[in-house]
Amino acid sequence: DASNAQKQHDVNFLL
């Protein structure tokens, strides 16, 4: 799911 992948990317960016 591309939407979920983008969400994970955002989380990693915040970390």
Swiss-Prot record:
GO terms for molecular function: monosaccharide binding. The keyword Chloroplast does not apply. Binds Ca(2+). Mn(2+) or Mg(2+) can also be used to a lesser extent. It is found in: Secreted, Extracellular space. GO terms for biological process: humoral immune response. One of its GO terms (cellular component) is extracellular region. Transmembrane segments: none annotated. Its main location: secreted. Its cofactor is Ca(2+); Mn(2+); Mg(2+). Keywords: Hemagglutinin, Lectin, Secreted. Sialic acid-specific lectin. Has hemagglutinating activity towards erythrocytes from several species, with high activity towards, rabbit, mouse and guinea pig erythrocytes, and low activity towards human erythrocytes. Hemagglutinating activity is blocked by treatment of erythrocytes with V.cholerae sialidase. Belongs to the tyrosinase family. Hemocyanin subfamily. This is Lectin 80 kDa subunit. It comes from Penaeus setiferus.
